[in-house]
């Protein structure tokens, strides 16, 4: 279990660091605002939320990104598309975040993409693999995992062998 948590910490640190790099070129504010919309209905989901919150708190305590503190806003989308769209809208227009991270469900991420693109807020997608996410073609959308089309090919080959 410890090895899995270490890997999760690394992944979330990389995601938050990537968000910082994207933001640094976009925002010269004193505080970097990061908005997150994840499915947090299970122990694993809650752990993801705690992990990213703890990572940001640690960075704010020990150091910053280019001297800028990080302000984290975390919402639970419950893997429901209407909540994801509401979260993305709130993050972009009300909370005025510099970057959105999420969602962890492709069915939620797909309808969030047009919201981020229209608001011109970069969106980093750490989990969703649906190929249509990046097919929508926005310069503001960055998907971390490989497309599900690739996984299907690999799984098919593995099954055949």
Give names to the regions the model predicted.
Residues 3-15:
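Bacterial N-terminal signal peptides that target proteins for export
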Residues 82, 96-161:
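Extracytoplasmic ligand/sensor domains, especially the bilobed periplasmic-binding protein
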Residues 50-72:
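Signal peptide-proximal N-terminal region
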Residues 26-37, 64-71, 160-161:
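Immediate post-signal peptide segment of exported/extracytoplasmic ligand-binding proteins
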Residues 35-53, 75-82, 104-105:
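Extracytoplasmic "Venus flytrap"
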Residues 1-4, 25:
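Short, Lys/Arg-enriched N-terminal segments with co-localized hydrophobic residues
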Residues 69-94, 149-154:
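Structural motif
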Residues 13-24:
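Bacterial N-terminal signal peptides
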């Amino acid at each position: 279990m410890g090895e899995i948590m270490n890997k999760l910490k690394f992944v979330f640190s990389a995601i938050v660091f990537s968000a910082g790099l994207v933001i640094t070129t976009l925002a010269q504010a004193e505080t970097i605002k990061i908005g997150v919309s994840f499915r947090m209905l299970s122990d694993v989901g809650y752990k993801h939320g705690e992990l990213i919150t703890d990572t940001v708190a640690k960075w704010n305590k020990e150091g910053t990104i280019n001297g800028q503190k990080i302000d984290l806003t975390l919402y639970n989308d419950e893997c429901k598309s209407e909540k994801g769209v509401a979260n993305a809208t709130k993050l972009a227009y009300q909370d005025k975040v510099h970057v959105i991270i999420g969602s962890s469900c492709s069915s939620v991420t797909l309808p969030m993409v047009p919201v981020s693109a229209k608001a011109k807020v970069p969106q980093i997608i750490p989990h969703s693999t649906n190929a249509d996410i990046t097919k929508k073609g926005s310069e503001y959308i960055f998907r971390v995992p490989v497309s599900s089309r690739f996984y299907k090919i690999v799984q098919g080959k593995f099954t055949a062998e």
